Amino acid sequence: MFKRKPNPFIAYELAEMKIRTGDLMGATRNITFGIANSDGEIVRNYYETQQPYSVPMKAAFTYLKGLVKINEDRENNIDAAISILNDALAIAPNFNLAKISIDALNAQKPTIQE
């Protein structure tokens, strides 16, 4: 379906599925396509809170980019993933899922032993 008529919505779903199955290169291709082909009017809806909300697709793809980064190397890419997720928040300050992910990643950072 994506090959016949590629669009950001299908690219998002494919990228999300590929992240879950460990195909990070495939997900990156879909994310790159999505970022390049998302204008400010296309939005992604999220329902993980009581009140559903929408963010620009570019923020949604940036969020997925952060997930790819952390899945590449969970120990060494925490700061890089947080930086990417902060980019998503800069695009959409109301992006609750990005905020939750940043908090979870900050909690995974090793504490400095004295």
Residue ranges and their predicted role:
Residues 1-4, 37-55:
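Flexible helix-coil transition and linker loops at the boundaries of alpha-helical arrays
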Residues 7-8, 16, 41, 58, 67-70, 94-95, 104:
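Residue-level recognition of tetratricopeptide repeat
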Residues 10, 43-44, 61, 98:
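TPR alpha-solenoid repeat register
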Residues 21, 72-75, 109:
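Structural motif corresponding to the intra-repeat A-B loop/turn of tetratricopeptide repeats
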